[in-house]
Amino acid sequence: MKTGGLSDFADFGEEDANCTQGIQWIKDVFTDCVDTDLKLLGFIIGLISLALWLIPLFPQLWQNYKTKKCEGLSLAFLFFWLVGDTCNMLGAILTNQQPIQKIIGVYYIIQDLVLWTQYGYYLKIYNRPTTSSARSNTIVVPVLALASVGSFFVFESALPPVGDHRVKRSFLESLNHQEGLPLEGILKMWPIFTSYTDMLGYIIGSMAAVCYFGGRIPQIIKNYRHSSCEGLSLTMFYIIVAANFTYGISVLLATTSWLYLLRHLPWLAGSLGCCCFDAVIISQYYLYRPKTPLAEDTERAGLLNSQDDSD
């Protein structure tokens, strides 16, 4: 392995394509070129982030099950989270990522759908009787998302297999070989994107980052209006902060050029930006948590002492 360093735009494509000094199994499984000590450290931290991302919803799901309530969750927060995970999933399919990345994308969506199911059940069915129309309004979003993901798998499996004379090529892949398209000048002007498929994956990744980033705002507003974070799992947000922070660090450690940093900017901003918003939610949790009798007595004594001093 060689030592790491930040270089210019020109070396990105060559280094990424060859990876002669990298660890081969990492490139085969994760398509990452790990050929420096810093990249190896970043890859290890990235694996930690990946492991953390497998479990963040479990504390919230368990709390919902124990309390039989989901009122503390903002519906907009859940919606943006589901849309963000769906965008990640579609991006992995459209850019033909490794199977492990597609499987993880499906896993995220399954977790989201379980959370949506809990939300609909405990809010609309468990605690009070409801009509079928009200139930359908609650579950329509996850059902549509699941149908969309399923349709992409059906479409992908319906494509002809690779053979001696037949090549399985999607519409997006065929676009990469077209000449004279309006966006061709953009690809040649500045080598941020290597193909139209690559550009579409970047756009979808940016949409996911915006959903993750902006989805926190409705939850923060709801906590502020109710002066309460009851129903939210503090453990979930701690895990999310740790996962986002370790992911951001892994990207920064793997950076070898300004172009690499620019290509990963949406995901980097989405992860580190979410840390800031999640820190606000965590601070709200401690600010709005119910006071213990001892704390109330101490606060009351302090007020009485201040009144005596003023007299």
Swiss-Prot record:
Q: Where is the PQ-loop domain?
A: 55-86, 214-245
Q: Which organism is it from?
A: Caenorhabditis elegans
Lumenal side stretches:
1-37, 96-102, 160-189, 255-266
Q: What is this protein called?
A: Lysosomal amino acid transporter 1
Q: Where in the cell is it found?
A: Lysosome membrane
**Record's Gene Ontology CC terms?**
lysosomal membrane; membrane; organelle membrane
Q: How does the protein's chain sit in the membrane according to the entry? A: Multi-pass membrane protein
Q: Print the domain comment field.
A: The di-leucine motif mediates lysosomal localization.
Its function, per the record, reads: Amino acid transporter that specifically mediates the pH-dependent export of the cationic amino acids arginine, histidine and lysine from lysosomes. May play a role in the degradation of autophagic substrates in autolysosomes by regulating lysosome function.
Pfam families under this entry?
Answer: PQ-loop (PF04193)
Q: Which Gene3D superfamilies match?
A: 1.20.1280.290
- What are the record keywords, sorted? Amino-acid transport, Glycoprotein, Lysosome, Membrane, Repeat, Transmembrane, Transmembrane helix, Transport
Q: What happens when the gene is disrupted?
A: Mutants are viable but develop slowly. They accumulate enlarged lysosomes and show an impaired lysosomal degradation of phagocytic, endocytic, and autophagic cargos.
Q: What is one Gene Ontology biological process annotated in the Swiss-Prot or TrEMBL record?
A: intracellular amino acid homeostasis
PANTHER family tied to this protein: LYSOSOMAL AMINO ACID TRANSPORTER 1, SEVEN TRANSMEMBRANE PROTEIN 1-RELATED
The residues that cross the membrane are 38-58, 75-95, 103-123, 139-159, 190-210, 234-254, 267-287
Q: Look up the domain of life of the source.
A: Eukaryota
Task: List the glycosylation sites.
Answer: 18
UniProt motif (Di-leucine motif) ranges: 303-304
A single MF term (Gene Ontology):
basic amino acid transmembrane transporter activity
- Cytoplasmic domain ranges by topology: 59-74, 124-138, 211-233, 288-311
Q: Which InterPro entries match?
A: LAAT-1, PQ-loop_rpt
